[in-house]
Amino acid sequence: MKTGVRIKQHDITDCGAACLASISAHYGLNLPIAKIRQMASTDRKGTNVLGLIEAAGKLGFEVKAVKSKQPDGTNNVEPLQKIPTPAIAHVIKNEKLLHYEVIYSVKKDRIQIMDPGTGELEWIKIEDFNKEWTGILLRRDSEPICLTNNHGIVKSICFSLSHILFS
């Protein structure tokens, strides 16, 4: 597994697809953003959460969307330290632009994100992340296994470990 794969989105609507491309590459499955855009039904407005879940499923990832809000409307960042990473966070940039970022690591007071807008991997303070985070998170339910043939070409796109163990 590669750690923190940097992927830069091609245009403003590609952030969700770029995040999924980054996570796929993290597990050794390199796919073009254009292919993931198709899988996620990305349109001129971008990709919605359902589209990302469906595309992730087609890639063999079992994911679910969760929302973390406290009664006062603020995000509860404590569960972030318990989520399996990488995960995709829905954020609002500059108080107006809906965007997705990949969370690669969470420490006590810092979070490592890959922002497809810049294509960079960076550590930021959790309180700064919390200011932009909508509370929506796409997290995986199990470790995927990617199979490749002896030429390094994907023979069978990622299968979830639970499919193998419980089929």
Residue ranges and their predicted role:
Residues 39, 132, 160, 164:
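Residues that form generic nucleotide/phosphate-binding pockets
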